[in-house]
Curated annotation (Swiss-Prot):
Keywords carried by this UniProt record: Coiled coil, Cytoplasm
Gene: sph1
Protein family: Belongs to the Sph1/Sph2 family.
Cellular compartments per GO CC: cytoplasm
Keyword Cytoplasm: yes
UniProt induction comment: Transcription is regulated in a cell cycle-dependent manner, with maximal expression around the time of septum formation.
Protein name: Smc-like protein Sph1
Miscellaneous note of the record: Overexpression results in modifications of cell morphology from rods to extended rods.
UniProt function note: May play a role in a late step of replication.
Compartments, record wording: Cytoplasm
Coiled-coil region list: 139-282, 318-487
Main location: cytoplasm
Amino acid sequence: MWNVDVTCIGGIRSGEATLRPGPNIVQASNFQGKSSFLAAIQTAIGTTGLLTEDHPLMENEDDGKVTLETDEETYTVSLTRATDSDEPAISRSGTPYLTRDQDQIAARLFAVLGEDNPIRAAVREENQERLTELLKKPLETENIDLRIEPLQREIKELEDEVAAAEAASADLPAAQQKVTRLQGELRDLNETRDELERKVDEETDQRALRDELTAKQSDLEREEARLERLENQVDRRKAQLDDKEAALESLDIPDSPTAEADIAEKQTRIDELAVKIDLLDDLHRSTKAIIDEGEIDLITDVERTLSGDTFSCFVCGAETTAEAVTERLNEISDRQESLREQRATLTEEVTQMQQRTREIESKRQQKAELEDEIKRLRVDIQEDQHEVRSIEATIEELQAEIEQREAEYEAAEKAGESHSAELKTIQQKIGSTETKLDRAQAELERIEAELQKRNDRQEQLETKRDELETLRQRRKQKYNELVNQFDAAMADIIGRFAPGFDGAYLDQKTDANDTVGFEINLARDGHTTDLDTLSEGERELVGIVTALAGYRTFSVGDRVPCILLDGIGQLAAEHIRHMIEYLENTAEILVTTAYPEAGSFDGETVSPEHWDVISHETAQSRDHPQITN
């Protein structure tokens, strides 16, 4: 049971009412505060001021307030008009029934079904694009699309890196062929040199000096090439180290969540609660139906007296009354609601714990990989630098030895000894070819390193693609459920209302950019038709069904136990009754409006007789329209 106390909201200066489980019909003529009362309930549950809408503070009043008292809590929400600006803004304070943005948006779209409901308005205006935007709103509050977009960018970057590495791999055959060719040329040059040397007198000192000098020069060129290659390698590894250290420093790992055992325990508890809720629901529904229909005598003996009917309890056999059974049913209903709240809380906790665990594990793995790579790079750089120093020392020694050998060789040459010009040319070619071979081998090593980098990036790419697919499946699941709920609700509505069309379908379409859109299509006389062919009442009916599909898909009933229905004057009185009967089992509390000429309804009638509301004449004298009916 809800008690609602209203001050200066819409067209109600002051008023209060009690809402009970089941249908609650606010029945009155125009300008008696029907719609304003529903706006007050909206204010209390926290669904006003959303989607560029204003809070419903009474015009020319600076303050308004709504107090909602439930069986468990009391919620007070105040509205205040700022008076220090040219265009006064209305702000909200206090704690509404719903505090999370995600819950408020879902309730505004799918539980507050007044004439200004955004879903109904989009259907009424045949705005399929706006309808798509609104149906996707709850998933936006889960940040699914916001998480998909950066993932797609990361995947694109990784794909570009892999493609670049693939391009580098295309150079691999040419690099391998170049190394093989230079090795063959060097082998041929060495054979030619050996042949020429055999023709030279190997007994002369000049021969020995020449061989020694050539060997030293070859050693020097080889060491210089090694030094250049190592220095370049050190520079590359230092750059990689800086990148890895920067990435590690920017990596933020949240605190570890509860252990997996807690998640399993909570999931077990959720399953247990679901069983209990279903059992209580079956008991409540069947027992209430027997009591409401006055069919107690079907299952037990009823003793009818002037003071009231009594009968034997059909469970324990004790004597009881319908009022006592009804009171017990209310207690069962309260127990159901408590179990639903526990289940919703546990479900939210499990979802958050699982998501947090996945994020932490991913970041820990990333951190471990970065630390391993940093450690390896540091060791490699240290080893390279040690080798650089060793090579530099070797080069200094070789340069000194070459200077000495050149002086000795020049002295021997002056003594009349001469070298073969052809042999000198071959020896020079050997040194040049050895240098080219060293450089070709270095280039081959670089390309092979790029191929290894490609493999690493490919693994990262697969991980990101899996994560993206998980998010897309979550989104697809909700979208499919939305379509199924629409189809099921529309089938029920057609059976109850017999409208002038055969069926309505919520079609889901995905474009080349993986963007999902929704479109309502109708069937009439075996042909597909548009919303503009419907009557005003039929269009409102389709809008309400669309909102109800969202209500069930996004479990809005687990967030707020009520549905507010207003602005259904386009429906005939019998159709209003059908709508109330249809919605009665959808939410614990149903609040709707009706005119007196619609007749009487089953359920609780809420009368505005004692409310202080703005009169029709006062409303007409305002500069701006005010919610009063």
